[in-house]
Amino acid sequence: SSEQVAVSWSRALASRPETDRQVTGEDMRSYMGKTLETIAELMLPEIEPALGMEIMRDCERVEQDYLIEHGGTLFPNLEKELERLSKSFSLFIVSNCQSGYIETFLEYHKLGKYFTDFECPGGTGLAKADNIRIIVERNNLDRAVYVGDIQGDLDASDSAGVPFIHAAYGFGTVNRDVPAVKSFSEVFEAAERILGSTR
């Protein structure tokens, strides 16, 4: 959804007299996986932090409204793969997004039926590693694996004590060799190698 989010954030920023910043899809891809505070520092370095966060909250509000109407761009065969995964594994989402983003995405694309639970810092105020731990504890998981695409995801998995699969088709790289997949359709086999079948 990076292109859609870029459009919505640019609309929000256009209404703010403090900045003439516009956001591209490439910008958004570089921000993916980062907390809102970090994005504010990167995107609006000339603006003092409290005002930067106020502007980011405006971006969030416009983004939610935009995504409710337009959704995001899905990976090819995403729903088919989610269905296949959900037959063997319980699926969860842990993301560094704001509160409401996951719900909006799942509702627009009618994908909620494949997921058991989700968490984000917008809901807890906590970092990704803590939110991974919350999901594991809240759902009484004795085995889990986290699929992510950037170094911060690997760091969060390490901190939470959860194995990691690098989604190499995503937005970033990681600093060491870990199990990796080149497309979403490879996640099932990678998870099965780490977890076995959980259902």
Q: Where are the language model's segments positioned?
A:
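Short helix-capping segments at alpha-helix termini
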Residues: 15-21, 47-51, 110-114
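Helix-loop "lid/cap" segments that line or gate small-molecule binding pockets
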Residues: 10-14, 35-49, 105
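Conserved phosphate-coupling serine/threonine residues in phosphotransfer and NTP-handling enzymes
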Residues: 95-97
